[in-house]
Regions:
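Protein-protein interaction and targeting regions used for scaffolding, dimerization, and localization
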Residues: 1-21
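Short amphipathic
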Residues: 21-31
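Acidic, glycine-rich active-site loops and adjacent beta-strand->loop/helix elements
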Residues: 164
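Short coil-to-beta-strand transition motifs
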Residues: 167-169
Length: 207
């Protein structure tokens, strides 16, 4: 009986944690390419080669890789994510920016006006972006149902208490709500390393 009770208590505890928290994902450096830049790097008629799907519906990892080049250094083997974008965009960490010699502003994906550029290289082909380099602002993707459950709305900033090996609370986490999203919190590898993140970790949403 005690064993059954313990199992029931553990199952209930897991349900409660799941209801009160969101799963966290660490997002590494990556590139989104426009049609023009995809062809400039990989040849006329080039298509993105899907390798695996990401947690957000319609987003996927591609086989294509590029090298980022800045005034101080370069970063090879940077993954391209699909699908194609209207404008090319590069997301890196602040630490990556030091390696490149470029300071990326902290922005949400898609907010690339007035941002610095970077050179993308594949073999002997290169594209110089005059803008589009950012460090992604920490954020939470949410379905409308989950946003209602947590009592938040699109554009609101919350705190994220990471329940990790080195717990910490992240401020200024922007909520992004859409029926096209799956509910996940996204941090970069600087933040993930700081809190001892490992795959499957969760976080509390705090006001």
């Amino acid at each position: 009986m005690n064993t059954l009770n313990n199992i029931n208590i553990e199952a209930l505890a897991e349900q409660i944690v799941s209801r009160l928290t969101v799963e966290v994902e660490a997002s590494g450096r990556h590139v989104h390419l426009s049609r023009a830049h995809l062809e400039a790097l990989f040849g006329p008629g080039a298509q993105l080669t899907r390798v695996k799907d990401l947690s957000q519906p319609g987003q996927f990892v591609c086989a294509q890789r590029v090298t980022l080049e800045g005034p101080r250094g370069s970063i090879p083997n940077v993954v391209v994510l699909g699908p194609e974008r209207k404008e090319s965009q590069v997301e890196i960490s602040l630490t990556d920016g030091v390696a490149l010699g470029i300071t990326p502003p902290v922005r949400l994906s898609g907010d690339i006006g007035g941002t610095p550029g970077v050179t993308l290289r594949y073999g002997d082909r290169a594209v110089r972006l005059d803008h589009g380099l950012i460090a992604a602002k920490r954020h939470v993707h949410m379905t409308p149902a989950d946003a209602a459950r947590f009592g938040v709305e699109n554009g609101r900033e919350v705190r994220l208490k990471c329940l990790t090996d080195r717990p910490l609370t992240l401020e200024g986490v922007e909520v992004r709500v859409s029926p096209q999203f799956a509910t996940f919190a996204h941090i970069d590898y600087d933040e993930a390393n700081a809190c001892g993140f490992k795959k499957g970790d969760r976080a509390l949403i705090l006001p």
